[in-house]
Amino acid sequence: MSILDWLIVLLPVAFVMYMAVHSRSYVRSVADYLAAGRICGRYVISVADVANALSIIVLLTQVEMYYKTGFAMSFWNKMMGPLGLVLSLTGFCVYRFRETRAMSLGQWLEMRYSRSFRIFAAALRSVSEMFANMIMPALAARFFIYFLDLPHEFTLFGHTFPTFMVVVVITLSLATTIICLGGTLALVITDTIQGLFCYPMLVIFTVFVLCTFSWTKEIIPVMSDRVAGESFLNSFDVDKLRDFNVFALVVTIVVTIMHRASWIGAGNTSAAKTPHEQKMANILGSWRNGFMTIFYVLMAITLITLFNHRNFSEKSKAIRNYLSHHISLQMVKDDAQRAEFDAAIAAIPPVTHEIGVDEPLSQDKNMDTPYYDTAREQFFRINGVPELTQQLETLKATNPGDTAAIAAAEDELRKKTGLANKNTQEYSTLYRQQMLAASMRNLLPTGLTGLFCLLMILMMVSTDDSRMYSAALTITQDVILPFKKNGFTPKQHIWVIRLVTLGVAVWFFLGSSYMSQLDYLKLYADIMCSMWLGGCGPVMIFGLYGRFGTTLGAWLSLVSGMLLSLGGMLVSRNWADIVYPWLDKHGWLPALTNLLPKLSGPFEPYILWRMDPQKFPINSTEIYFITMMVSMILYFVGSGLTHLIWKPGPFNLDRMLHRGKYNDEGKPEEKFDWSPKAIWAKIIGITPEYTKGDRAIAYSVFIYSFVYGFGLSFIGVLLLNVFGVWQADWWKYYFFVVFILEPCIIGVISTVWFSVGGFIDLRQLFRDLRNRKNINDLDDGRVNNGVSVADAATVASEEASDDQK
């Protein structure tokens, strides 16, 4: 990068770090450090969430997905629009959790269930979260090595150091510094500033892509050049594109509802002035989320057009050579073998595919296929597979009676073949994940290169500090604090969190070093997250909205979900080499072969279970759904048994939510109005707390998301296709208007809107921090007899008053 690019990167990052240092002077209590004093406005939270939502791992995952599917699947994603809208407008889970005034998930779990359950659940969530997120610095480090063309190793004072680990240390140091300086307050302030930087940059890169590639002459021809069943444009011609059916949609809907609160309880979720402000921040998020999605789509379109259109054949060839060379530097240690590997890749000719003349591209045969095939041949050569194959054939021909030698040769061949296949898979994984880094390095001019690097750094820092802080907060508040009967002093409390944060940073460093090869990332993340997500849904939803749930039900739900998820994932991972042979050895295959089709029969073709020696018959989506249903059933069974045997009575929700006689904020109790107008307002989440401006925002979100986004652009187009009115050629206009033009207009407007609102709210936040007078040192997350220690005096007074009456 040029000096200008480095200035563009360093100055904003330095300003972000300065604001983190500045925030430290405003931390006067544990509540400030843990929940930003609970005085944040809606725009501060919403803009900060922009930075949290943008991450390198999400960018790479989304770009990889859209690179494989194009626009076509985006149309079907609109089916989820009404659900997300309703959840945002009603403040589902978020509003009630803020009403509890809990500083962490565990504090609420103890208020709702028990202390032992708090400790177990918090520990489980922390372990799951830390294992799943510790790979994020590794992904970021690898991205910057490819984007900045850094050497994989460098020598300093006669010692050789891996660049990868140095970048990881820098990444974690930035995140750890922000956390230790001001906790949630520092995160909110720095994330808001990063969000204010990010949104204009998204607009700039969107304009750049649309000006670099012609929509009608380059993008659409490439997107149209796909075989039947794998269309990148026609949303009704995607049956061979990926697994997509009614059952998958049902699971997505269930997951969206059941896990609405599964990761709640840290940072911004407890920082709003009131539950209403938290709810409005989520509603405002509906305006910003769409533009982030189009950024991911446009980055994928950039890669699709760049790598598949002959107008960019020379540039794409140079990028592919650069990308493969970096991968070979990482994977092939022998200089001579690496030179031969690079020469074989360089010998692949540039793109000569002529759209409309040559055979359309597919997932199995496309412009990347020659690179995967060549890499596979080279890895087989490097591992000596051809020589071992020849030696085995010679041994069988010359000495067929030497069974021991033949068996040993076969074992060695299998071992080397497996290693070559693993190397090929690792190459393809790195190739897909680093396509964006290599492409943007070679595509962007001076100035924009620095802006893109800045955007990636902000994505990295905002995500790493949030994930690390979430884990540190959960461990401190919900695993350590419950064992401290009298709590810590405020100063001790904050230092404990800082020390735990350092421990989490070390854990992330060690995890990144072991996960540096980036192999099986999705499977690994799924297994780790499922430890918590498998059974936490019923615990969260019915704990916030029901009086029936009990501690026994919560235990059964969480433990069963954890065991079923882990069991399903591990069986799936080891099916071909361990589980299937074991079933065959014990004679269970015939029975299972007959049983599985009978079990899936009522749900076919959406669920199809057939015995297969290579693949576990039940896929991950089905495992996830079964786990959620079993854990939900056990939650109610356990709760029912508790009420049947011990008869504890219904849980006191009013006390937990500070409602009714426990309302210490002077808010009038809302009485439901059964008039049509009131019912309609209730449906879209409007309450007496809404001002005229709030109502305008809520109605605008409803009209845009439901009436236009779902009604016209999805249901309307769906009906036109069903009745045969829609023409295949119309898709290019549809996607340009709905997925390009409209989000760009909204992006420009919302950039100005959120920037002004975020700046005003941020300034007000500093004013409120300076002018605070009532600071409660007991507000530190402790719970006593199901009541927050900070609320104990108020609750005792109200209950004593009731006893006198």
Q: Where would I find each of the regions flagged by the language model?
A:
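Solvent-exposed, non-transmembrane helices and loops of integral membrane proteins
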Residues: 771-794
